[in-house]
UniProtKB/Swiss-Prot annotation:
Expressed in brain, kidney, lung and liver. PROSITE patterns: FBOX, WD_REPEATS_2, WD_REPEATS_REGION. This is F-box/WD repeat-containing protein 4. It comes from the Eukaryota. Part of a SCF (SKP1-cullin-F-box) protein ligase complex. Interacts with POUF51. Residues 25-71 form the F-box domain. It holds the Pfam family WD40. One of its GO terms (biological process) is Wnt signaling pathway. Keywords: Developmental protein, Repeat, Ubl conjugation pathway, WD repeat, Wnt signaling pathway. Probably recognizes and binds to some phosphorylated proteins and promotes their ubiquitination and degradation. Likely to be involved in key signaling pathways crucial for normal limb development. May participate in Wnt signaling. GO terms for cellular component: cytosol; SCF ubiquitin ligase complex; ubiquitin ligase complex. It comes from Homo sapiens. It is linked to Split-hand/foot malformation 3: A limb malformation involving the central rays of the autopod and presenting with syndactyly, median clefts of the hands and feet, and aplasia and/or hypoplasia of the phalanges, metacarpals, and metatarsals. Some patients have been found to have intellectual disability, ectodermal and craniofacial findings, and orofacial clefting.
């Protein structure tokens, strides 16, 4: 008992040990904190880590977000955008940089979150601590457990209404806007049982996007359409655009003034075209000299003037509308000549792509052309495309034909 009491006293004394600036030691530590911050801002990650081992005060001092922000902005998937906006202010920057090294080195733990018996073409979205995923003609909502690498098995909600498979869906204004193989668009309120569907196209609706109360859809019937989200005007088409090609992907500009379509590149020479959202008129087309069949399967805006695209021609292309609409700024080629089904970005340096064979997920550092890491998620007998990718600063989620996979970079 006496020994135990002595140990407790030692622990309490250690806990009470002052984290204040040491009175003795080099004169450097007696400088004003502002000057110390300036000096330490020139240190790299390794030097800051070693300095933190000197004493408790320096460990606290070198954990300051200000010292790690510059390092984080140059790191992969640390929660900072290209313009320096911090998307995760509640998480210490030092902790994010630590996890970022696992992304850079490809250190992760693979797991399977969901399985299904029949082959699917799932799509998914993340929102806060919830995951929404399509299975056949349903959309299911699951809640993540605190570790982010597992799900509560019982769905939070099930959203139905389509007669055929859900091809695509987005989350907008507490609504789920879904595109179905039955040619219909579905509107589901997330926190109620309200569901409306209406006939939108003559054939399956392959893609949909919704921003600012406006819905855009693209279909196999070679049209793109613009719709209002307002409850009193659901199903009233604002514009019908003849694209001369099957529309595989679609995205609204953050400025809400235009939208881009990614088409099959069979009936029209350009698979990427930008349309005026208010008039439905063609504004411009991107690129030139695309080979027939170079369809764009995924397209996304990173900013009002920059966007990324990928598809059948095995390239990811980065476009900047301020420089040129005929030539992309940067491109990355899938090294095994596989179709690229989907892409995701951290808004800064990290790019993730999903390939058509063996469930291969690739990570790219956009500052270099070569692939950084590749993760084959299926073996030869069960080869599957990666239909959809989503990522956070700690995890990457990949939806395949039979499974939903997670790559955990926080606890590799």
């Amino acid at each position: 008992m006496a020994a135990a009491a002595g140990e407790e006293e030692e622990e309490e004394e250690a806990a009470r040990e002052s984290a204040a600036r040491p009175a003795a030691g080099p004169a450097l530590w007696r400088l004003p904190e502002e000057l110390l911050l300036l000096i330490c801002s020139y240190l790299d990650m390794r030097a800051l880590g070693r300095l933190a081992q000197v004493c408790r005060w320096l460990r606290r001092f070198t954990s300051c977000d200000l010292l790690w922000r510059r390092i984080a902005r140059a790191s992969l998937n640390s929660g900072f955008t290209r313009l320096g906006t911090d998307l995760m202010t509640s998480v210490p920057v030092k902790e994010r940089v630590k996890v970022s090294q696992n992304w850079r080195l490809g250190r992760c733990r693979e797991g399977i979150l969901l399985k299904w018996r029949c082959s699917q073409m799932p799509w998914m979205q993340l929102e806060d601590d919830s995951l929404y995923i399509s299975q056949a003609n349903f959309i299911l909502a699951y809640q993540f457990r605190p570790d982010g690498a597992s799900l509560n098995r019982r769905p939070l909600g099930v959203f139905a209404g389509h007669d055929e498979d859900v091809c695509h869906f987005v989350l907008a204004n507490s609504h789920i806007v879904s595109a179905g193989g039955d040619g219909k668009i579905g509107i589901h309120k997330i926190h109620s049982t309200f569901t409306v569907k209406y006939s939108a196209h003559e054939q399956e609706v392959n893609c949909v996007d919704c921003k600012g109360g406006i819905i855009v859809s693209g279909s196999r019937d070679r049209t793109a359409k613009v719709w209002p989200l307002a409850s009193g005007r659901l199903g009233q088409c604002l514009h019908t655009i003849q694209t001369e090609d099957r529309v595989w992907s679609i995205a609204i500009s953050p400025l809400l003034s235009s939208f881009v379509t990614g088409t099959a590149c069979c009936g029209h020479f350009s698979p990427l075209r930008i349309w005026d959202l208010n008039s439905g008129q063609l504004m411009t087309h991107l690129g030139s000299d695309f080979p027939p069949g170079a369809g764009v399967l995924d397209v996304m805006y990173e900013s009002p003037f920059t966007l990324l695209s990928c598809g059948y021609d095995t390239y990811v292309r980065y476009w900047d509308l301020r420089t040129s609409v005929r030539k992309c700024v940067m491109e990355w080629e899938e090294p095994h000549d596989s179709t690229l089904y989907c892409l995701q970005t951290d808004g800064n340096h990290l790019l993730a792509t999903g390939s058509s064979y063996y469930g291969v997920v690739r990570l790219w550092d956009r500052r270099q052309r070569a692939c950084l890491h590749a993760f084959p998620l299926t073996s030869t007998p069960l080869s599957s495309p990666v239909y959809c990718l989503r990522l956070t600063t700690k995890h990457l989620y990949a939806a395949l034909s039979y499974n939903l996979h997670v790559l955990d970079f926080q606890n590799p």
